[in-house]
Amino acid sequence: RLGAASSAELAAFFALLTPLEARNWVKARIATSMPRDDSTALIEVDVESADGSRPFSALARADLLEQLEQLPAPPKRLRVLSPFDPVLRDRSRMQRLFGFDYRIEIFVPAAQRKYGYYVFPLLAGERLVGRIDMHRDRSRDALVVKALWWEAGIRPSKARRQTLQAE
């Protein structure tokens, strides 16, 4: 589910291993010491950062290329992501991979919030394009948008707004 990650990111994601245990698990599964067709074999890969800075080293399943070839094209829809989506949990990873600085602000005092209490990231294809603060009004059986922010470089075109409305 992570695609490519460091041993520390694996430990944090699964929350079952210490970083040292994860590092030892990874060492035992590097493809040079295991058959490449073993589903737990790992390879070392370089991953490009969203900002174009130097690539960072990560680990991936040895069958990564085969997995990538089988992936469907990203959906054309605009997706509203849960703030608790696994890809959003690690803020530094999120920033590095997507150039998206995200923080759920439910525990931040209202006066110190940058966006809002419960803001949802917006995903278009492979890019995080904005954030939306919305809630359900049960009395009207409606979804109420309190605020919408597009990321830098994203044009809030009529087509984009229609795509969001359809979601």
Describe the predicted segments one by one.
Residues 1-167:
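Long, charged, low-complexity, helical-prone intrinsically disordered regions
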